[in-house]
Amino acid sequence: MTIIRKSHPLMKMVNHAFIDLPAPSNISSWWNFGSLLGLCLIIQIASGLFLAMHYTSDTTSAFSSVAHICRDVNYGWLIRYIHANGASLFFICLYLHIGRGIYYGSYMYKETWNIGIVLLFLTMATAFMGYVLPWGQMSFWGATVITNLLSAIPYVGTSLVEWIWGGFSVDKATLTRFFAFHFILPFIIAATAMVHLLFLHETGSNNPLGIPSNSDKIPFHPYYTFKDLLGVIIILSLFLTFVLFFPDLLGDPDNYSQANPLNTPPHIKPEWYFLFAYAILRSIPNKLGGVIALVLSILVLALFPLLHTANQRSMMFRPISQLLFWALVSDLMILTWIGGQPVEPPFIIIGQIASILYFSIILLLLPIAGLIENKILKW
């Protein structure tokens, strides 16, 4: 008799995706982040569901309902902090996952890569709308500033902003619709992640060498299930330490004050995971130009497959590209720091230089480095 996991229609799908999946024998721990992102999504959906049971999306009671969750609901404080810091964990894993893809040339699987970019946009939209829900000062003003950026779109901008707001300012209608979208988007993300996996399993995983691994495959279970499990244990240990000991470290103190349209916070800034894009937005003194740069800072990822000039896929044996890659990582860290600083010298010029460098490395220097390395290696 055939084993049920190989014959049952549903089990067969799971089997082909997670058990008998042929995987390269040499993939490193950098390949753990896909499964960790799945874990993050499950944590966020589960904790979010319990928060939604007690949250009210009304401007008069949203802030109080979050306080009620923390004070009166059994382990409400824990669920709230797991959800808030879970977003940070999600983005840490997401950025490391993208960095791995760039370093090892995984972007050459174009369909998987492009679906990944769609996933990044969806996750960013979800996180932004979630940040508005507690209805603190930074929630309100962050929502006002970021949605207002759409008014830079010629001709339809103002109408578009008022349509999103559901009125002439961020108010009850905005909060209600943001809650609705924040609730539904994670399920859309989960469905899109399935498509991401579908495309990945069409080609099979890349590996650190960037060469075909068809001649040397091993089953996903037990090898990579246990390897992933180690990553899960390490990440969860660090995450719970963070949640239980430093729950407010990454939050903004302004968000503990209720939203007040008559009082603007001294420095309006988003959560840390958006600061690099926020710095790029602020480095251009023109509103429309800033918005275009903001969108391009993420969309530029779609150009990686087109700008790949090297004859080797991975950066593992390409020292010039490696140097540029780590320069890009450092540049993103500088942009993140600048995004959290006030708009005054010397931060303005540092942000502008870092923004130019960000686009230069991706659009110009990495493709040139690839060509130089081809020459050096006489490939």
Swiss-Prot record:
Cite a single Pfam family from the UniProt record: Cytochrome_B
Source domain of life is Eukaryota
- Keyword Heme on this protein? yes
Note on how the cofactor is bound: Binds 2 heme b groups non-covalently.
GO BP term (any one): mitochondrial electron transport, ubiquinol to cytochrome c
Give residues annotated as binding heme b b562: H83, H182
Q: How does it sit in the membrane?
A: Multi-pass membrane protein
Residues passing through the membrane, by range: 33-53, 77-98, 113-133, 178-198, 226-246, 288-308, 320-340, 347-367
Q: Where is the signal peptide?
A: none
**Primary location:** mitochondrion
UniProt cross-references to InterPro entries, sorted A to Z = Cyt_b/b6_C, Cyt_b/b6_C_sf, Cyt_b/b6_N, Cytb/b6-like_sf, Cytochrome_b, Cytochrome_b_C_euk/bac, Cytochrome_b_N_euk/bac, Di-haem_cyt_TM
Q: Which GO terms describe its cellular component?
A: mitochondrial inner membrane; respiratory chain complex III
Question: Which positions are annotated as binding heme b b566?
Answer: H97, H196
- GO MF annotations, alphabetized: metal ion binding; ubiquinol-cytochrome-c reductase activity
Record function comment: Component of the ubiquinol-cytochrome c reductase complex (complex III or cytochrome b-c1 complex) that is part of the mitochondrial respiratory chain. The b-c1 complex mediates electron transfer from ubiquinol to cytochrome c. Contributes to the generation of a proton gradient across the mitochondrial membrane that is then used for ATP synthesis.
What other remark does the UniProt record contain for this protein? Heme 1 (or BL or b562) is low-potential and absorbs at about 562 nm, and heme 2 (or BH or b566) is high-potential and absorbs at about 566 nm.
State the family it belongs to. Belongs to the cytochrome b family.
Q: What is this protein called?
A: Cytochrome b
Source organism of the structure: Chaetodipus artus
